[in-house]
């Protein structure tokens, strides 16, 4: 169910900074029409830290409504407060999400036992699948393959991981401990080729916000074992993978989407729009990928 190119969706805002529901509806539909195989609303790229709880829930509800069962919706339900994560996960299930994505708790830095407690409690509070989001670069903590294996063993609805460790060897380690059926999705566009070669089955992608068709074709080539074609597409996409992260995400993707006429280039403080020099580099990368003239 969860494989291929899955987009970590931006949340469009209008010029007054409010959630732009009309733009979001069109954006979600465009993603599906371009070949995206799954959608992740209200993750990091969706600026969830600056959404109110009501906005967070509304974004999920709209995404599910527009997707209409065409592709799975993996709703963001992360928090560094277990009770809050449970509440968000339960709302996502009630709204009709196909799965939830739960990030490792940030800032308060639980140990491995604390991670087990957090994820097992969230998983047992819902009946839909849960995907672990392991991103040490943002949360400071790193869930070990052993902790992941214990969670998979004890919680049958913990089905996969979005791995943003940047450690390609983790795919093989987690495959050995969690089993071959455990869904491993790359959390980094730039390393997705190697990730898939090690046994990954897709990517929760930022770049696919801007280049959904290319990212979908790249993942399809990987899953078909056609790594020559995948490498060709990777070469076309790599400058964009890099340029979009020259400044903190999602400032780059929002600028690029505004260049495509999809959304307004508006972020919520403390996120700010990109510098002119960064915009020039993103433009160049978009031209390299043949997304603009």
Curated annotation (Swiss-Prot):
Belongs to the DapA family. The active site is at residues 133, 162. PROSITE patterns: DHDPS_2. Its EC number is 4.3.3.7. It is found in: Cytoplasm. It catalyses: L-aspartate 4-semialdehyde + pyruvate = (2S,4S)-4-hydroxy-2,3,4,5-tetrahydrodipicolinate + H2O + H(+). Keywords: Amino-acid biosynthesis, Cytoplasm, Diaminopimelate biosynthesis, Lyase, Lysine biosynthesis, Schiff base. Pathway: Amino-acid biosynthesis; L-lysine biosynthesis via DAP pathway; (S)-tetrahydrodipicolinate from L-aspartate: step 3/4. The record marks 44, 107 as: Part of a proton relay during catalysis. HAMAP family: DapA. Homotetramer; dimer of dimers. GO terms for molecular function: 4-hydroxy-tetrahydrodipicolinate synthase activity. Pyruvate binds at residues 45, 204. GO terms for biological process: diaminopimelate biosynthetic process; lysine biosynthetic process via diaminopimelate. It holds the Pfam family DHDPS. This is 4-hydroxy-tetrahydrodipicolinate synthase. Transmembrane segments: none annotated. Catalyzes the condensation of (S)-aspartate-beta-semialdehyde [(S)-ASA] and pyruvate to 4-hydroxy-tetrahydrodipicolinate (HTPA). It comes from Brucella ovis (strain ATCC 25840 / 63/290 / NCTC 10512). InterPro entries: Aldolase_TIM, DapA, DapA-like, Schiff_base-form_aldolases_AS. The keyword Cytoplasm applies. The gene is dapA. One of its GO terms (cellular component) is cytosol.
């Amino acid at each position: 169910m969860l494989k291929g190119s899955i987009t970590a969706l931006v949340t469009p805002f209008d010029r007054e900074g409010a959630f732009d529901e009309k733009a979001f509806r069109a954006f979600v539909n465009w993603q599906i029409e371009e070949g995206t195989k799954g959608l992740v609303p209200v993750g990091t790229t969706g600026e969830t830290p600056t959404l109110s709880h009501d906005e967070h829930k509304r974004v999920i509800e709209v995404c599910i409504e527009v997707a209409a069962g065409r592709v799975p919706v993996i709703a963001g339900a992360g928090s560094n407060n277990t009770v809050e994560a449970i509440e968000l996960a339960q709302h996502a299930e009630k709204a009709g999400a196909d799965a939830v994505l739960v990030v490792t708790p940030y800032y308060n830095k639980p140990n491995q036992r604390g991670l087990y407690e957090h994820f097992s409690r969230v998983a047992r509070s819902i009946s839909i699948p849960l995907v672990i989001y392991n991103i040490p670069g943002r949360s400071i903590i790193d869930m070990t393959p052993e902790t992941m294996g214990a969670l998979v063993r004890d919680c049958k609805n913990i089905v996969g991981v979005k791995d943003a460790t940047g450690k390609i060897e983790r795919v093989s380690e987690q495959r050995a401990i969690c089993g071959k059926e455990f869904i491993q999705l790359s959390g980094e566009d730039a390393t997705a080729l190697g990730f898939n070669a090690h046994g990954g089955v897709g990517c929760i992608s930022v770049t696919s916000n801007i280049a959904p068709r290319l990212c979908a074709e790249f993942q399809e080539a990987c899953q078909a074992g056609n790594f020559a074609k995948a490498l060709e597409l990777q070469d076309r996409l790599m400058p964009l993978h890099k340029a979009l992260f020259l400044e903190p995400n999602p400032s780059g993707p929002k600028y690029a989407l505004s260049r495509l006429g999809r959304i307004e280039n508006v972020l919520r403080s403390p996120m700010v729009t990109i510098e002119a020099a960064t915009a020039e580099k993103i433009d160049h990368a978009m031209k390299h990928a043949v997304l603009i003239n």
